[in-house]
């Protein structure tokens, strides 16, 4: 069953079968063949169908109705395409390379779990991405960007629209982005965090992309020089030991020269670790993570190392040529002459926890573990070079890289997206801390303009008309406010509509604000008098008037901006207001202008600002995932939290961690009423999300463990192949057989008889 999830349609990808991308995909897909035995995590069979269903955006429904291919036909075709992927990948040319991994007694997942299988269509041939949990790498005060992108990804309607439009190349010629390393491979080890001093906040903890590259290059040059000198000396010592050892006796010196050249090539090809700085732990960040239930991205590598050690010990006992240490741990080969312990790759995380085995890992330790554990998807270039370098295409590449990756968890490095952002808006091209709301507003407007410009290409299916005005950004986020100004002299009323993509929540003085009370019957009244008199077109003069603001149209996704930042005349700068602002999990919104304007919302995401002012601080976000419940995203790390933790960031002078942007998603009134009637619904939902998280972690650990053991087995083969005794035994065996066959021939006359 696991083959269906981790493979590519070999039949449809035949024109590109010789490309490097498909070879890599085939190797990874065939490494997950079903085998019998014990060792895999047991996962309860999900009662769901073969593919989980996700919410369909409002504008998509109209597209699919107009399309001659109905949604059922689309799903059937997608499922057929999906099954062809994973059936055809069972037999590939690279199967021989990973076939030895079946010696480890692993049992594949015999389940139709929604964690592995998601909704697929012709426009989303690799699923809708609802089963992926990825963190975002911070490139230097980019936490404002990471938090907003995480909230948008966890809105199914937004994510599916970005994945579907504009339509990519046909599925026949499309290559799955199973493992995106980028132009510059980002590899993190324990040494990656030793060259710089960690900083306490995100302002000083990172550098810009350009500066970071130069900074990394400087350190890499130093590390390369040190590594080259030490590695050269080590190679010479290894050659001397081999020359004096029994295994190396009688070996030609030219072989050593060839081996040295091979080692130099391997050293050049092996990617050097990236040197970076992660945000140091402090009381503010540790208090934020107090409500953590389960670490998803950033958990230690203990499970992988333990299982790898057990499998390696078993293999060592079965193979006399495999070298083991005193503890029975497996020794694998990195190159021809240097043997290392595979458990050393976990020391970066385990060393930091040696003295805290029974304590919860800090946020700094989790971020280091997440970067080392990987995979790190470095999206540092446009995946389709012929397309325009826009923010929309950059975000689409990020979403596709997450959705199509073979791993369930990991980290994304949005290098190209941040680069495009700094080019599109010079206000973000600085090392200063940026405003998350300003970024969200600019992003949605930029997306809307891009869709309007490319509207004919954004159509669903084969029916593409030029007279269509569909724009899923406006369909999801656009609302309308009505301004009515009544002249108190002639009673003339002037009306004007104002669209909005995010709704402002004003903060007045030291007052407490209740969002539910404010939006239950929303209206604002203001008297226009004195210097603010209104010019009446009927009276032809400035008159006193009354202005009323109400809601005319409500959006599907209601984003609320809590205006905590304001300019202070006394301090001559922007300050942060710590007024208490209450926000509910379910929100009722209506208008006094029109009683028919009414919608019920449920909280979907919260962007949180940590700090005493707008010029500095740190952004994190809390999102409600459709499969895994409430998740806390802190740049590289992701963890599940309790529902009551979501409502704790209301703000007060003693707490600098406050909610800043709220995302509410429209829900059906009947659904909420049924939930109120059924007391056990919330507990059942909580049990389901907890079970999904357990499945996610077990699946992810199993896949990573499988990959490590397959790689270790290949390295073991290389090591055994370089041992002269093994080579001699392999070469002598066929010769002895030939001699025995010749000895059976007693007469040359009858030698033609076999």
From Swiss-Prot:
Biased composition (Basic and acidic residues): 250-272, 727-738
Residue ranges, compositional bias (Basic residues): 1-14, 739-748
Annotated segments matching region Disordered: 1-76, 194-273, 726-754
Recorded GO CC terms: cytoplasm; cytosol; nucleus
Catalytic activity: Thiol-dependent hydrolysis of ester, thioester, amide, peptide and isopeptide bonds formed by the C-terminal Gly of ubiquitin (a 76-residue protein attached to proteins as an intracellular targeting signal)
GO process annotations (BP): protein deubiquitination; proteolysis; regulation of protein stability
Pfam families: UCH (PF00443)
Biased composition (Low complexity): 42-58, 222-233
Residues at the active site: 143, 618
Keyword tags: Hydrolase, Protease, Thiol protease, Ubl conjugation pathway
Coiled coil (UniProt feature): none
Gene Ontology molecular-function annotations: cysteine-type deubiquitinase activity
Domain USP: start-end pairs: 134-667
Entry EC number(s): 3.4.19.12
Ranges of compositional bias, category Polar residues: 194-209
Other remarks in the entry: Present with 98 molecules/cell in log phase SD medium.
Membership in a protein family: Belongs to the peptidase C19 family.
Name recorded for this polypeptide: Ubiquitin carboxyl-terminal hydrolase 9
Species name: Saccharomyces cerevisiae (strain ATCC 204508 / S288c) (Baker's yeast)
Gene: UBP9
